[in-house]
C-alpha cells in the first residue's frame, strides 16, 4: 500500500491528489476490483475465448 507523507505548506487536496496517483500507479485498486467476485475457471476461460474471437 502506498504511503504519503504530508509535506510542509501542502494542502490536503494536493496530498490526496498525490496519494491517488500513487495508488493508481501501484495497481492495488485494480487488483482488488478484479478479485471482488469469484469467477469460476470455466467462465474465465469462456470469457478469454470470446475476447480472443473479437480481435
UniProtKB/Swiss-Prot annotation:
Report the Gene3D superfamilies cross-referenced here.
Answer: Ribosomal protein S8
Ribosomal protein found in the keyword field: yes
What name appears for this protein in its UniProt entry? Small ribosomal subunit protein bS21
GO CC annotation terms, alphabetical? ribonucleoprotein complex; ribosome
Q: Name one Pfam family in it.
A: Ribosomal_S21
Keyword Ribosomal protein in record: yes
Give the source species: Phytoplasma mali (strain AT)
Keywords recorded for this protein, A-Z? Ribonucleoprotein, Ribosomal protein
Family statement: Belongs to the bacterial ribosomal protein bS21 family.
* GO MF entry, a single one: structural constituent of ribosome
InterPro entries xref list: Ribosomal_bS21 (IPR001911), Ribosomal_bS21_sf (IPR038380)
GO biological process assignments: translation
